[in-house]
Amino acid sequence: MAKKNSKTKNNDNTIARNKRASHDYHLEERFEAGLELQGWEVKSLRAGKANIADSYIFLKNGEAWLLGATFPPLLVASSHVVCDPMRYRKLLLNRRELDNLVGKVERQGYSIIPISLYWKHAWVKISFALAKGKQEHDKRADVKDREWKVDKERMMKHSVR
């Protein structure tokens, strides 16, 4: 019997990432939530069509809502359903988690920023974080630190030889 090649198997269940989140914000505390989706949205996500780059999460009436995420409908989606790719999507969270988020957002001035959208078993989950915006000098310092880390690795690699 032949061995299974683990390199060919794709274990990455990520649908979409918000790569700008860590660049534009200080990410403090991370959370995971489910999404309330319609059928055509699930089909679109299975095809890998999603964009959460310009999205954010807001709290209204004790519920969390995802705004600005784009799930473009497939051309073969049902024609009798009106597809709105930019609609508000409800996040499925426990009351305790919602109360925690409300307290931090209203009292401490945090924003809630989506980080990634992924499959967990058969469910679509969204990972998000409490975040504070970065100033321009903070962004420059992060770039400088990242470049120094790369240079340090290069120097260590060449010094070992």
Swiss-Prot record:
It is found in: Cytoplasm. GO terms for cellular component: cytosol. PROSITE patterns: SSRP (PS01317). GO terms for molecular function: RNA binding. GO terms for biological process: trans-translation. InterPro entries: SmpB, SsrA-bd_prot, SsrA-bd_prot_CS. Keywords: Cytoplasm, RNA-binding. Belongs to the SmpB family. Required for rescue of stalled ribosomes mediated by trans-translation. Binds to transfer-messenger RNA (tmRNA), required for stable association of tmRNA with ribosomes. tmRNA and SmpB together mimic tRNA shape, replacing the anticodon stem-loop with SmpB. tmRNA is encoded by the ssrA gene; the 2 termini fold to resemble tRNA(Ala) and it encodes a 'tag peptide', a short internal open reading frame. During trans-translation Ala-aminoacylated tmRNA acts like a tRNA, entering the A-site of stalled ribosomes, displacing the stalled mRNA. HAMAP family: SmpB (MF_00023). This is SsrA-binding protein. It comes from Psychromonas ingrahamii (strain DSM 17664 / CCUG 51855 / 37).
